[in-house]
Amino acid sequence: MPRASDILSHGIPYEASNRAVPNKIDWRESGYVTGVKDQGNCGSCWAFSTTGTMEGQYMKNERTSISFSEQQLVDCSGPWGNNGCGGGLMENAYEYLKQFGLETESSYPYRAVEGQCRYNRQLGVAKVTGYYTLHSGNEAGLKSLVGSEGPAAVAVDVESDFMMYRSGIYQSQTCSPLGLNHAVLAVGYGTQDGTDYWIVKNSWGLSWGERGYIRMARNRGNMCGIASLASLPMVARFP
């Protein structure tokens, strides 16, 4: 994934509001987060990160939990700069979703391979009207975004110790704030025994980590770049 400074973003730079955000939050408890998914042998993490933050915002606005289609983004958002199973960016997906409605997982199911776009406008459910971006590496800003708005799409530098993670608060000595190579979803944050952490939803199935999740050390100098390429869309019903 490219550096944030290399991206020509059409998003709105997020500015933390003055209103206080909670010291801890877990959006799973409010129904903003769907079940853990599995991207399989396809480099589509960016699509899962996109649908994850879309699902949270749709729940926030419509009070309805819907699992959205990653496969539609894999198959259809290439002209907006994405590369299917070869990688992509959440912000490119938002640009696509400004023009096309996002279908549900059930109407456009995941296949873990890039195929021909089979988008059906009649089945579109949600669209993007704009999106916030946070490229500063400022974890306080990300806390404000997640704490006040909901689950946010983020990117991190994944090294072998991340892949081998089983449980506990992950603290890496090897990952970089710059080498972003994997997109995930920040669904909350908290503190345990004096150690601040992010609650992060991955797309590697339930058998990885803490039933598909990882708690990543927070306020450790933007560890693994979690606050270097964050975003959150404004979502409305389609059309």
Task: Name every feature range the model reports, one short phrase each.
Residues 1-239:
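Catalytic-core signature of thiol
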